[in-house]
Design a protein with these regions (language model features):
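Alpha-helical segment of the N-proximal tetratricopeptide repeat
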Residues: 34-63, 67, 106-121, 131, ...
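Residue-level recognition of tetratricopeptide repeat
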Residues: 37, 71, 131-135, 162-163, ...
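Glycine-centered coil turns and helix-coil junctions that link the paired helices
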Residues: 44, 51, 78, 82-86, ...
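Canonical tetratricopeptide repeat
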Residues: 77, 138, 169, 206, ...
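Alpha-helical repeat scaffolds
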Residues: 88-101, 119-128, 147-159, 182-195, ...
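Short, low-complexity N-terminal intrinsically disordered segments enriched in polar/charged residues
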Residues: 230, 239-275, 279, 377-379
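A solvent-exposed, acidic/Ser-Thr-rich amphipathic alpha-helical stretch
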Residues: 269-325, 345
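Short beta-strand edge/turn micro-motifs at domain boundaries
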Residues: 347-378
Length: 379
């Protein structure tokens, strides 16, 4: 009951603050060398970064330097975002800051990004800098803070207007059973608090993903569309299609079965056959001969070269990958064809891989293996 009361308290705080109150509440850094405007922009950038919106964060840091070219916090923030020392520019950017003289908050940040263990270093800084939320937030992941769950609960209570990232972390913990029992109700409570506090792209992206975890694909599509609206299709667009396909998984399964039936029907109209083939499909036999890359026209010419008496696909089983971009179908094709004036009983085990798009399904590759009868004609 005590823990649930803490959740309800956080939910109430999120409802009371709202997104418009963030700038007026706690600052990530208590003092910077930047002008007031540049400081505010850096603060928004840190909020974006801690909410996994790195492109938006980088734009904020760059904007702060346009306003104030001497804003050390923005320079440190850009260095902190850079890639690692092996191939990126992080080392050179940090080296360029070696002789800077900033505020205690800025110098502490520089020390953190130079350390070998950021969370532990941040936790240590937080003990000496109680008003600098940045170090308290990063320190939430330190083993010195106890469990990450406890660390983020404590941060959300201490810095409620900056708690978006922590609320997000807590929502995922309950959605995925990370250190706690899976609990959809609690996960959604944290999500709603997160959304009230930070109505931006990542909040909707998280709401979509967690909705999908619990099978609510329609809700996932709706929130992912909001994420695209706020953060652009480049980062968030792919998942809209994925959730839409998951919401229509049964229809896609039937589409694959129907496509298999078309290819197993020697009397299917050519336009129907061509519609389920890719521009080039890889066709393989289990006899270890090289596979053939065929256009739709080449495949149909080969299929039409056989005098089929009958053919059908049986026991079709369809499996999808997690992203719903590929399907694997396995089935047993049976029938008869004429060869040198003789009737041949046809029986093969077929496995095929299909591309799944919002427009439909198309064959990528297929393999035929004789199973209790003759395989494909030698032609």
């Amino acid at each position: 009951m005590i823990f649930r009361n803490r959740i309800l308290t956080l939910a109430a705080l999120g409802a009371a603050l709202g997104p418009a109150s963030i700038a007026a509440q706690d600052q990530w850094l208590s003092e910077t060398s930047c002008s007031d405007v540049a400081h505010a922009i850096v603060n928004e950038g840190i909020t974006a970064r801690n909410n996994v919106e790195h492109g938006r964060a980088k734009g904020m840091y760059q904007a702060a330097l346009v306003v104030d070219p001497n804003c050390i916090a923005a320079k440190i923030a850009l260095a902190d975002m850079a890639n690692g020392s092996e191939w990126g520019t992080r080392s050179s950017q940090i080296a360029a800051l070696a002789d800077v003289s900033g505020t205690p908050s800025e110098m502490a940040w520089l020390e953190v990004i130079n350390s070998s263990n950021g969370p532990n270093s941040s936790y240590k800084m937080a003990q000496d800098m109680p008003d600098d939320a940045l170090f308290h937030y990063w320190g939430s992941w330190s083993e010195n803070a106890g469990s990450a769950l406890d660390g983020h609960m404590a941060f959300a209570e201490r810095f409620p207007s900056l708690a978006g990232g922590s609320l997000n972390t807590l929502a995922y913990a309950y959605a995925q059973g990370d250190g706690v029992d899976t609990d959809e109700v609690k996960a959604r409570e944290f999500l709603r608090s997160y959304l009230r506090l930070y109505n931006e792209a990542n909040a909707h992206d998280s709401f979509a993903e967690i909705s999908a975890i619990f099978g609510d694909y329609e809700g996932a599509v709706r929130h992912q569309q909001h994420a695209v609206d706020r953060g652009g299709a480049t980062v968030y667009g792919e998942r809209v299609g994925m959730y839409w396909r998951l919401a229509n998984k049964d229809e896609y399964r039937q589409s694959v079965v129907d496509a298999v039936d078309v290819l197993a029907n020697p009397d299917a109209p050519e336009e129907e056959t061509a519609a389920v083939l890719s521009d080039q499909s890889v066709m393989c036999l289990s006899s270890m001969v090289p596979c053939s890359v065929m256009t739709a026209a080449e495949y149909m010419a080969t299929a039409n070269g056989t005098e089929w008496l009958s053919m059908s696909a049986n026991d079709v089983d369809v499996m999808f990958n997690d992203m719903m971009t590929r399907a694997v179908a396995t089935h047993h094709n049976t029938g008869q064809y004429m060869l040198d004036g003789q009737t041949v009983d046809y029986s093969v085990r077929v496995s095929s891989v299909w591309e799944i798009t919002n427009q439909g399904v198309s064959l990528i590759t297929a393999n035929w293996a004789p199973m209790g009868g003759a395989g494909l004609p030698g032609s």
